[in-house]
Design a protein with these regions (language model features):
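Structural preference for beta-rich elements and adjacent junctions enriched in aromatics
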Residues: 4-285, 289-294
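A short, flexible beta-alpha/helix-coil linker loop
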Residues: 36, 145-147, 267-268, 299-301, ...
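Catalytic-domain carbohydrate-binding cleft regions of carbohydrate-active enzymes
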Residues: 156-157, 166, 176, 185-192, ...
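Low-complexity/repetitive intrinsically disordered segments
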Residues: 1-3, 601
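Outer-membrane beta-barrel transmembrane domain signature of Gram-negative proteins
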Residues: 111-131, 267-331, 367, 454-509, ...
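A short, polar/proline- and glycine-enriched secondary-structure boundary/capping micro-motif
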Residues: 6, 38-41, 82-84, 102, ...
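Residue-level recognition of well-ordered beta-strand positions that form the cores
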Residues: 16, 74-76, 92, 141, ...
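Exposed, low-structure sequence patches enriched in small/polar residues
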Residues: 243, 328-633
């Protein structure tokens, strides 16, 4: 995602193009009165979403007048995949008037509809003479980097001049092949830091452009958390980049099929061996709103041989998922059903795990409507389920999760727009049907006012059976013993409307936590004193009082965005937490020279708090200048 994708708090004009008119996916675009742009990919089904990390090549101008504002948009046909034999696209338009908390849609304005649903759009007809030219796109780039790292025996400095090449070719207007050589992601955003007091790994979102395109096809059983393919397994190791030697990709549609094929080779880095990654994803459209799909991944590590007397072998993962949906249930209601099954081979030849140990399966029935909504899901993960190119923070469980929600609107009120009440239940067992986790969470109220302000309050009862000792700070200072823990918590949140020049949010959660109590509060502010300037400080503090010991955590984040023009942006990101004692800053200047051709200036600096001398000392710093040029034939 680039800085231009941050206009959600502004008045804006929004539209989508469903270029295959299949009512399953679409290109999402919007522009505000300052000609700042947002674009992304809409994916329907359970867990439907708008992925704003996709960046297309297009341009927009805007002008504010005495009677309002107007915009002019230029979008090359080459930016889209489409069917040249069809003269009809799906389309919808929306205007967001923030000062009135008002949203106006061209069509799809009923309560169970919206701009994020291509099946609720209208039709754009009479499209003729559309062409992608030769369909060849060449994107060379050059990069100058420099870095400095402070070591115990001195400083290690490095500098380099390098380059790479991306080639895209449209085999058909709806099917595109891509090659990338010596790929670099210096301009990618840094991950948002969190303080993780849970037992499980956190799934950070993908930020790299090459892996973002086609993400709507790669999605597998969304909302079920199965993740047989997770692109951050490729070219990253614990957040640190591993060089990508080359990659090849095929994306698009052919008839009723959606295809996504990927192969990437990563290079050697320290003790990390070169690897080859392959991914294949195929989905077939069924009827007007349903799909069935398969996924396959392979991970092959070169020269690994034996690992602690075990023989590492190529790791293969296979999966299938089914999505059934209708928007005409009982006349005008939405109803969705999802099912999936995934399995993989053993990591080592000597493994004694069986097929069911290395598999996951589940289903989900969803009734996402307004004012009544409900869902129930069930899933099982084997005790050795861990796909090599996927993400599985937890295995060896059976989980049942139902929820019920009632969200009435109040059209006759001048104060309240909507109130939401929700009941969620989680019942998680081990594979022997012994209870591990049980949570009942009740939203007593979640009120959206006509002003756009929101206030909510939840209560929850939780049961946890800890099977193994838990090092909660990950430094061996506080170890939670094997036991059963029962707690109650309460949480509340207040958030003001984002269209204001000063908007803010505050939240607090307090109650039982393992063997003691926890109180967490957070506060964030969004300041927009001038057009094109946005400042976002955020602070989260957590007090933990346990029978085994006490501690507190502090997390500070600050982001500043400056839009000099609709083609020149600067962002700075500062983060600190007192568990790692790391202070880091990421600074990026992006100049869109012409749509598709960019100049990036990037500077990163990380400090470690030295408690002995009560100061921060530099751990490392780095800078990069990267320029890319897109030429279309």
């Amino acid at each position: 995602m680039c800085i231009r994708d941050s206009i959600v708090a502004d008045e804006r004009f929004t539209w989508f193009f469903d270029t295959f008119n299949d009512q399953r996916s679409a290109y999402f675009m919007e522009v505000n009165p300052n000609a700042l742009r947002t674009d992304g990919l809409i994916t329907t089904g359970q867990g439907q979403s708008i992925n704003l990390n996709w960046d297309g090549i297009w341009d927009a101008k805007a002008e504010i007048t005495d009677i309002g504002w107007m915009t002019e948009v230029k979008i090359p046909f080459r930016t889209f995949n489409f069917d040249p034999e069809s003269d009809t696209w799906g389309v919808n338009f929306m205007r967001v008037i923030r000062r009135k908390s008002e949203t106006v849609l061209w069509t799809g304005y009923q309560r169970n509809q919206g701009i994020e649903r291509p099946q609720d759009g209208g039709l754009l007809t009479g499209l003729n003479g559309m062409s992608q030219g030769l369909g060849l796109e060449v994107v060379p780039f050059g990069i100058l980097t420099g870095s400095e790292q402070n070591l115990t025996n001195g400083k290690d400095t490095d500098s380099d001049i390098d380059g790479g090449l991306d080639i895209n070719y449209s085999i058909t207007p709806s099917l595109k092949a891509s090659l990338t050589f010596n790929t670099d992601f210096a301009e990618a955003e840094v991950d948002q830091r969190i303080v993780n007091l849970t037992r499980f790994a956190v799934q950070f979102p993908e930020q790299r452009d090459f892996f973002l395109e086609g993400s709507n096809i790669y999605q597998f059983a969304p909302a079920s958390g199965v993740n047989p393919y997770f692109s951050r397994r490729i070219g990253l190791n614990e957040g640190q980049p591993i060089p990508i030697t080359y990659g090849a990709r095929l994306l698009g549609n052919t008839g009723p099929y959606n295809l996504a094929l990927l192969h990437v080779r990563t290079g050697e880095l320290g003790e990390i061996s070169p690897e080859n990654f392959s991914v294949a994803r195929v989905k077939r459209n069924i009827g007007s709103e349903s799909t069935v799909g398969v996924v396959y991944t392979r991970r092959a590590t070169e020269g690994s041989g034996n690992v602690e007397d075990f023989t590492l072998q190529d790791r293969h993962t296979f999966g299938t998922d089914l999505e059934l949906g209708t928007s005409t249930f009982l006349g005008d209601k939405n109803l969705q059903f999802q099912a999936f099954f995934v399995f993989h081979n053993a990591q080592f030849e000597e493994s004694t795990t069986d097929f069911w140990d290395r598999s996951s399966r589940g289903f989900r029935l969803n009734y996402p409507n307004d004012p009544w909504a409900a869902h129930v899901s069930y899933r099982e993960f084997g005790n050795a389920y861990n796909p090599a190119v996927g993400f599985a923070p937890r295995n060896a469980f059976r989980r049942l999760q139902p929820s019920f929600e009632y969200s009435p609107q109040f059209p006759g009120s001048d104060i309240i727009q909507q109130i939401d009440w929700e009941l969620r239940f989680e019942h998680l067992m081990d594979l022997d049907f012994e209870l591990l986790t049980q949570e009942v969470r009740l939203t007593l109220f979640d009120i959206t006012f006509m002003s756009g302000d929101v206030i909510s309050f939840d209560v929850a009862r939780n049961y946890e059976r800890l099977e193994f000792p838990f090092d909660i700070r990950r430094d061996n200072s506080i170890i939670l013993p094997v036991d059963e823990y029962r707690t109650w918590t309460a949480s509340g949140e207040i958030r003001t409307a984002s269209y204001r020049k000063v908007s803010m949010g505050a939240e607090i959660e307090t109650g039982g936590f393992w063997s003691g109590t926890q109180t967490q509060y957070g506060f964030d502010v969004s300041l927009r004193p001038l057009p094109g300037l946005e400042l976002n400080p955020e602070y989260i503090r957590t007090y933990v009082d346990l029978a085994e010991g006490n501690f507190s955590t502090d997390l500070f984040r600050f982001e500043a965005n400056i839009d000099f023009t609709n083609s020149l942006f600067f962002t700075t990101n500062i983060q600190f937490d007192n568990l790692s004692n790391l202070l880091g800053t990421n600074n990026r200047l992006r100049w869109i020279i012409t749509p598709g051709s960019d100049l990036y200036l990037v500077y990163n600096h990380n400090w470690l708090e030295d408690e002995q001398f009560d100061r921060f000392r530099t751990l490392n710093r780095s800078g990069a200048i990267k320029v890319s040029y897109t030429h279309r034939f």
